[in-house]
Regions:
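Active-site-proximal beta-strand elements of phosphoester/diester hydrolases
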Residues: 3-13, 117-126, 171-175, 233-237
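A structural micro-motif
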Residues: 4, 64, 104, 118, ...
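Core catalytic region of metal-dependent phosphoesterases/phosphodiesterases
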Residues: 9, 14-115, 193, 204
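Short, solvent-exposed loop/turn segments at secondary-structure junctions
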Residues: 13-14, 41-43, 73-75, 125-129, ...
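A short acidic (Asp/Glu
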Residues: 18-19, 45-48, 78-81, 132-133, ...
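Proline-aspartate-enriched helix->loop->beta-strand connector
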Residues: 31, 169-178, 212-213, 218
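Conserved beta-sheet core of the metallophosphoesterase superfamily
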Residues: 58, 65-69, 86-91, 180-255
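Active-site-proximal loop/helix segment associated with metal-binding centers of metalloenzymes
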Residues: 91, 116-198
Length: 257
């Protein structure tokens, strides 16, 4: 598979209808890669319902190849029955995928990839602010959709820091964002923020001081906006990765990246 263009978008939560017009624009002899910044929602129900949705996506969008950062409202791909770990030469590292759905791939936390010519670090996961509502629904016999290992563990965060401290990346892809960039105007007023576990956001703040990066992209907060210089949050927009990178990297000396 030779991917000719790369795009990036935010949370889809299982609804891939936004990609219909994009797929129609892809030449019939090309494949375009789409990075989803977490909560793709393809491993949410852990039942036949997920399989039906993935089958529909694989059939409907054959000229799009999806690469999913892990969000919080979905199972870790390694916990999903039938997942294989496959090396992908296009991006230079391993992904998880189910062979029945060849255009859906799950990026691995704490791994580096090459998207186009951009050295990229990927760190998925986040805390669910509706955790207790989901657990209550589950206790009443409904489906909660809460995953105990939704966040990176302390050990995982430490390993990522130790592995990549001092490294240089063109691009960082995360689901949530560093604590200092959080869009607090989007916080839900009925959520007691003192009960929210923001350990991952605090760690990401530390990580961004321990690596060099050109651009940082995240999802999670359901809005499209700039968070800081060289940092953007995506939700519904579908952007060409090259356009984002060229915009932010034109004022940087990237010869050492």
């Amino acid at each position: 598979m030779d991917i000719t263009k790369w795009l990036v978008t935010g949370d889809t939560h299982g609804d891939f209808t936004r990609f219909y017009n994009l797929h129609e624009a892809v030449p019939k002899d090309e494949i375009w890669g789409v990075i989803i910044l977490g909560d793709a929602g393809l491993n949410y129900w852990l039942s036949k319902r997920d399989k039906v949705n993935k089958g529909r996506i694989a059939h409907k969008y054959p000229r799009l190849s999806f690469f999913c950062v892990r969000g919080n409202h979905e199972a870790r791909p390694e916990d999903v029955e039938g997942m294989d770990k496959v090396f992908m030469p296009d991006i230079g590292n391993y992904v998880y995928m189910e062979l029945d759905y060849p255009n859906i791939h799950y990026l691995m936390d704490g791994h580096e990839y090459m998207f186009d010519t951009y050295r990229t670090l990927v760190c998925g996961g986040a805390y669910s602010i509706d955790k207790y509502y989901r657990l209550e629904r589950q206790a009443l016999g409904g489906y909660g959709g809460w995953f105990a290992n939704e966040q990176l563990s302390q050990e995982e965060m430490e390993n990522i820091t130790n592995t990549f401290k001092g490294e240089e990346f063109h691009l960082v892809l995360t689901h949530t964002c560093p604590w200092s960039w959080q869009p607090r105007d989007l916080f839900l007023s009925f959520i007691d923020q003192s009960k929210v576990d923001d350990s991952m956001e605090i760690w990401l703040d530390q990580l961004k001081e321990n690596i060099t990066y050109g651009v940082w992209l995240c999802g999670h907060y359901h809005d499209d906006r700039q968070l800081a210089p060289h940092a953007e949050m995506l939700y519904y927009d579908i952007r060409f990765l090259e356009d984002i990178m060229e915009y932010w990297l034109e004022d940087l000396d990237t010869t050492t990246l």
